[in-house]
Regions:
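Acidic/polar-rich alpha-helix caps and helix-coil junctions
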Residues: 3-4, 8-153
């Protein structure tokens, strides 16, 4: 009465995502980030802040779930050396999150993307690939606050 109503005749979301709605249109709890990822971020942060005990606690929570009851599968990480612990955390991220498409961004964040990718025979990586271009519309809206990332100007 006095207003128009538009009903879409097709869905624009992924069918798997549409299954996550209840019959009342509310979201069901969709997992956007895994708890193991959160724990590994905590481990990395604690290690970089020089708190190895906390880093090991986070790391061991992830490894304990993976090892189950067989402690021979994954021995406990006991090193408190920051460099060694950093490598253990990085390796755990590699195996725990291996098929979740975060590896490249981890390598970039750690500043080792070129080294690791070239060692794996992926020689088309360039330093400019560490950053993505900013959308020009966002740069324009910022009125000079944002500038385009290097190599994309």
């Amino acid at each position: 009465v006095g207003s128009e109503m538009c009903i879409r005749d097709r869905a624009s979301t992924d069918p798997a995502l549409r299954k996550e709605y209840t019959n009342k249109g509310f979201w069901v709890n969709i997992r956007l980030i895994r708890y193991a990822d959160v724990l590994l971020m905590g481990a990395e942060s604690a290690n970089e802040k020089g708190i190895p005990g906390e880093a090991i606690d986070y790391l061991e929570q992830v490894r304990a779930r993976a090892r189950g009851t067989n402690s021979n599968i994954l021995p406990k990480v006991t090193t408190t050396d920051q460099g060694e612990l950093r490598e253990a955390i990085r390796d755990e991220r590699r195996v725990e999150l291996g098929l979740e498409f975060d590896r490249f961004y981890d390598l970039v964040r750690w500043g080792i993307a070129k080294e690791v990718l070239h060692a794996a025979g992926k020689t088309n990586y360039q330093d400019k690939n560490a950053l993505l271009p900013l959308p020009q519309t966002e740069i324009d809206k910022s009125k000079g606050v944002l500038v385009q990332n290097p190599d994309y100007q």
